[in-house]
């Protein structure tokens, strides 16, 4: 059917075009805006088109036959490509998963989601889509790389343009390929490159490819250990220390030599033994007795199944949370001990992992608790700074540095005060005149004894500029505990000073206090000997704790003390 002459379009003529009706309607609805700017020459004709529905309307359109013919050929090729055998799932294959823009190299491909593509802008902003997370491993897809080792001047972009141009222009049109490559390669070079790298199936042999997926995505191994690993697989060596530490775990079958609740099978053994005796007395039993016996046996089976389910539930928890390896488990637990204040509190909290099936969420919960603990300690440091009039972080650094210098100066002053009264010249003259080792004067010996005595342990102080402490008075220290110690926030000022002087951890002091107060509630009084019997620490520290609690009314002496 020719479009060079004016024709009146009817239903039969539209059917002869062999276009889909949707595409045909799209063509005719865009003719007005497309050809409105075309100059009207001597071949301008009239054209009438009809909509194929109950609201059919006729309109007069002016068109250029040459332009219309060219546009219809383009639409025919476009429609043929849309109706080709390309699956519908691949229509969005080259679009960004978040902003839906068309992708051009370079772009990002997720190596875990496999079908998620991102543009560089969305990737740099850390955007997520569907199951894709911004912490997944990724692959940079770019086409400015060299594909063939022997062709250093041909990039992947040039290879794609070459194949696409040959598909549209046909084999042998090397000039068109050279023009598509912006004359970067001569037609003879293009012909030589195609014959050397693509012709006759040599492409896969040059690149040593077996599957297109293997060039981007590594093969996934559905095993616990990698098949290509140089380390030997785990084996169940009964004599090894690792086997004993893992409670006899058999990795091949995923079970233990000594399973949990080893007496569960004894229920079935009791039933089997009883069943053997019942076979001998089966004739003498009544129907009621047989029903009762059967119900008892069913009850034993149900109890056995319940114990098996409990065993498998514990195995599942161990497998999900990775509790098989004892060394890793202990190191993992010790990582969060500080967040709970004590080992006992941490171990009690770990029992809640059985109600949290997702181990990642349980780890996130522990991390949040640890972060809460760190934030709590930081707030106490800021409270202490605010009490001393410090309002800025720069002032806090200056305060910590000056406080540390003041502590050191106070220690130096105390040490100097002990040695000022000693006459070094008198000591030197005595030893030079008396080399036989005779005892010196009483005053000199007493001073030497004072200098050589063991110094008392200094209180727990803040050092290194990392923590903050109170200002020191000229006569004594205003002691302060490290706020990071467990139980620090539960102490008042007097208890903090006691723990600092006695060098006690706040949580340990609270435990000792609870023991003594509990014993006081039982007996109505508390002796110092009873306190030393309950608290197995230094007797001097026990005396300090006892006197402190007695002074503040937490405990009382027996009536015989007067």
Curated annotation (Swiss-Prot):
SUPFAM superfamilies: Homeodomain-like, RING/U-box. Zn(2+) 2 binds at residues 110, 113, 132, 136. Keywords: Chromosome, DNA-binding, Metal-binding, Nucleus, Transcription, Transcription regulation, Zinc, Zinc-finger. Induction: Under heat shock conditions, strongly down-regulated in L2 stage larvae with levels remaining low during the L3 and pupal stages. In second instar larvae, down-regulated 1 hr after starvation and then appears to return to normal expression levels 4 hr after nutritional starvation. Its main location: nucleus. Disruption phenotype: Late-larval lethal. One of its GO terms (biological process) is regulation of transcription by RNA polymerase II. Residues 154-198 form the SANT domain. A zinc finger (ZZ-type) spans 91-146. It is found in: Nucleus; Chromosome. GO terms for molecular function: chromatin binding; DNA binding; transcription coactivator activity; zinc ion binding. One of its GO terms (cellular component) is nucleus. It comes from the Eukaryota. Gene3D superfamilies: 3.30.60.90, Homeodomain-like, Winged helix-like DNA-binding domain superfamily/Winged helix DNA-binding domain. InterPro entries: ADA2-like_ZZ, Ada2/TADA2, Homeodomain-like_sf, SANT/Myb, SWIRM, TADA2A_B-like_dom, WH-like_DNA-bd_sf, Znf_ZZ. Zn(2+) 1 binds at residues 96, 99, 119, 122. Residues 471-562 form the SWIRM domain. The keyword Nucleus applies. This protein is produced by a bicistronic gene which also produces the Polr2D/Rpb4 protein by alternative splicing. Component of the Ada2a-containing (ATAC) complex composed of at least Ada2a, Atac1, Hcf, Ada3, Gcn5, Mocs2B, Charac-14, Atac3, Atac2, NC2beta and wds. Component of a complex that does not include Gcn5 or Ada3. May be part of several different complexes, including Gcn5-independent complexes involved in RNA polymerase II-dependent transcription. This is Transcriptional adapter 2A. The lineage of its organism: Eukaryota, Metazoa, Ecdysozoa, Arthropoda, Hexapoda. The gene is Ada2a.
């Amino acid at each position: 059917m020719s479009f060079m002459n004016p024709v009146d379009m009817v239903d039969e003529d539209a059917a002869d075009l062999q276009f889909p009706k949707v595409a045909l309607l799209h063509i005719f609805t865009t003719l007005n805006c497309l050809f409105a700017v075309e100059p009207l020459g001597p071949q301008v004709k009239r054209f009438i088109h009809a909509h194929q529905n109950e609201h059919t309307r006729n309109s007069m359109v002016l068109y250029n036959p040459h332009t219309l013919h060219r546009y219809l050929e383009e639409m025919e090729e476009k429609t043929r490509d849309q109706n080709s055998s390309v699956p519908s799932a691949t229509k969005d294959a080259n679009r960004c998963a978040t902003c839906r823009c068309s992708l051009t190299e370079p772009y990002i491909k997720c190596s875990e989601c496999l079908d998620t593509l991102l543009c560089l802008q969305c990737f740099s902003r850390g955007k997520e889509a569907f199951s894709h997370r911004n912490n997944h491993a990724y692959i940079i897809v770019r086409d400015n790389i060299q594909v063939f080792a022997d062709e250093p001047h041909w990039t992947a972009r040039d290879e794609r343009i070459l194949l696409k141009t040959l598909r549209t222009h046909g084999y042998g049109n090397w000039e068109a390929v050279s023009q598509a490559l912006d004359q970067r390669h001569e037609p003879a070079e293009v012909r030589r490159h195609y014959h050397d790298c693509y012709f006759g199936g040599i492409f896969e042999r040059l690149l040593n490819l077996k599957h297109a997926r293997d060039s981007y995505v590594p093969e996934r191994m559905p095993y616990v250990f990698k098949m290509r690993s140089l380390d030997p697989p785990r084996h169940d060596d009964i004599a090894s220390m690792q086997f004993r530490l893992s409670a006899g775990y058999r990795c091949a079958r995923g079970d233990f030599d000594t399973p949990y609740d080893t007496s569960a099978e004894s229920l079935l053994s009791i039933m089997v033994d009883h069943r053997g005796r019942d076979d001998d007395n089966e004739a003498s039993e009544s129907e009621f007795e047989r029903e009762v016996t059967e119900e008892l046996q069913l009850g034993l089976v149900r109890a056995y199944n319940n114990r098996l389910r409990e065993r498998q539930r514990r195995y599942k928890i161990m497998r999900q949370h990775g509790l098989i390896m004892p060394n890793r488990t202990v190191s993992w637990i010790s990582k969060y001990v500080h967040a709970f204040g004590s080992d006992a509190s941490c171990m009690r909290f770990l029992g809640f992992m059985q109600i949290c099936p997702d181990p990642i969420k349980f780890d996130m919960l522990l991390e949040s608790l640890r972060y809460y603990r760190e934030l709590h300690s930081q707030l106490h440091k800021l409270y202490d700074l605010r009490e001393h009039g410090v309002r800025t972080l720069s002032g806090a650094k200056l305060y910590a540095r000056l406080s540390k210098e003041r502590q050191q100066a106070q220690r130096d002053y105390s040490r100097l005060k002990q040695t000022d009264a000693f006459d070094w010249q008198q000591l030197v003259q005595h030893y030079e005149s008396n080399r036989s080792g005779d005892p010196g004067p009483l005053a000199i010996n007493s001073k030497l004894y004072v200098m050589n005595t063991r110094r008392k342990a200094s209180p727990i102080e803040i050092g290194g500029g990392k923590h903050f402490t109170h200002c020191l008075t000229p006569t004594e220290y205003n002691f302060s505990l490290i706020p990071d110690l467990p139980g620090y926030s539960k102490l008042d000022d007097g208890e903090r000073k006691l723990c600092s002087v006695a060098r006690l951890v706040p949580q340990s002091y609270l435990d000792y206090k609870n023991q003594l107060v509990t014993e006081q509630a039982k007996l109505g009084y508390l002796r110092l000997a009873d306190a030393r019997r309950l608290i197995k620490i230094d007797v001097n520290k026990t005396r300090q704790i006892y006197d402190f609690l007695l002074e503040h009314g937490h405990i009382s002496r027996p009536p015989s003390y007067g």
